[in-house]
Amino acid sequence: MSSKTRKSSRVILEHEYVPEHRLLSIEEAVQVLKMLGIKPWQLPKISVNDPIARLLKAKPGDIIEITRRSYTAGEAKYYRFVVAYQKGVK
């Protein structure tokens, strides 16, 4: 990816309709999974090839935290498990 493409891609994260995304550290991921009482693969998935995952340099097995604005809660956190989809396999 060229530096120009990378720079223009970063603008995606700054768009008003794109919620904040961040990679969780291992410690944070363990804490979130304990709090939710689930295993990582039970989280909704996000492809390692997703534009946001690529910008964050996410690897399969990582967990991405998404913070969305909510009219009722003010702010809501969602989590996605990064997976490496193989071509032709869903």
Swiss-Prot record:
A single MF term (Gene Ontology): DNA-directed RNA polymerase activity
UniProt xrefs under PROSITE patterns: RNA_POL_H_23KD (PS01110)
Gene Ontology annotations for the cellular component aspect, listed alphabetically: cytoplasm; DNA-directed RNA polymerase complex
Keywords noted in UniProt: Cytoplasm, DNA-directed RNA polymerase, Nucleotidyltransferase, Transcription, Transferase
GO biological process, one term: tRNA transcription by RNA polymerase III
Subcellular location(s) of the protein: Cytoplasm
EC number: 2.7.7.6
Catalytic activity: RNA(n) + a ribonucleoside 5'-triphosphate = RNA(n+1) + diphosphate
InterPro entries named in the record: Arch_Rpo5/euc_Rpb5, RNA_pol_subH/Rpb5_C, RNA_pol_subH/Rpb5_CS, RPB5-like_sf
Superkingdom, taxonomy of origin: Archaea
UniProt function note: DNA-dependent RNA polymerase (RNAP) catalyzes the transcription of DNA into RNA using the four ribonucleoside triphosphates as substrates.
Family, as annotated: Belongs to the archaeal Rpo5/eukaryotic RPB5 RNA polymerase subunit family.
Subunit structure and binding partners: Part of the RNA polymerase complex.
Entry-linked HAMAP family: RNApol_Rpo5_RPB5 (MF_00025)
Name of the molecule in the record: DNA-directed RNA polymerase subunit Rpo5
Gene designation per UniProt: rpo5
